Amino acid sequence: MTSPLAIYRIQFRPSFGFVDAARLVPYLHGLGISHLYASPVFQARACSEHGYDITDPNSLNRQLGTEAEFRELVGMLHAHGMGLILDIVPNHQAASTQNPAWRSVLEHGPASPFAAWFDIDWGADPDGKLRLPVLGAPVDEILERDELRLDIDEGSGPHLRYFDTRYPLSSASWALLLEAPAGASRPALVAAMVAGLREATPEAALRVESDLVRAYRDDEHVRAYIDVALDHFAPGTTGARARLRDLLALQHYRLLYWRTGVETINYRRFFDISDLAGVRQEDPRVFDE
């Protein structure tokens, strides 16, 4: 490893990726630059303009280019006797449902295999929930305006949707959601899966949920049943808001009005940015995983 003599920082973004940086190497070498200091290159939130809101620290950011293009950049630097300094952002990640680790924590709470990654004080909430200051108004107003809805797609199954954000459901709430509506006969496959979800580990629950999503896509009887169950939570349906409140009570997170929620937040943030969650970098196991 050579000691840096002259460093030039580059800011990656969707409009400036690995190929663009590689083209600059000969020019920067001619200026006497010894090292590039690069902004984060790992997978970040969609359309991130800075890359510090990392969602997967084990994958390159697809918006910046391919692995082959990244290797070409590194090869170009080496060919010119230059080095690369990477900002790996070890101290925080995106508190976003686009982040699989954070999403797992939302779905499974302290039982998530990723719960130890983040500095969360579960005991600070009376019900042991992760407190999320993400709503544009108190939750009762949000429910009255029908802005929080239960939705489903063929890729990820049922979820709570607040505008463009989708929040995962706990295994216990899947069971509530899929209880047989009045007059409906629950398919045996759904009944078996619901039973499997009640006491499942996060890993087992993920498999059951994947099977259920596949059945929703491929089995017309399962699809029809789940659609009827979802209709009981739809805006305008009698008792729908009360059912949504019951569903919210079963989650491992508490959705809060952002103006007041920040006063009782129970996870460490990056400075005062609520959508960047602090990573427990003092624990080597976080980086081993």
Where do the PLM segments sit?
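Alpha-amylase-like alpha-glycosidases and glucanotransferases acting on alpha-linked glucans and related
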Residues: M1-L5, R9-S15, C47-D53, N58-I85, ...
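Catalytic domains of carbohydrate-active enzymes, especially glycoside hydrolases
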Residues: A21-R45, E69, E289
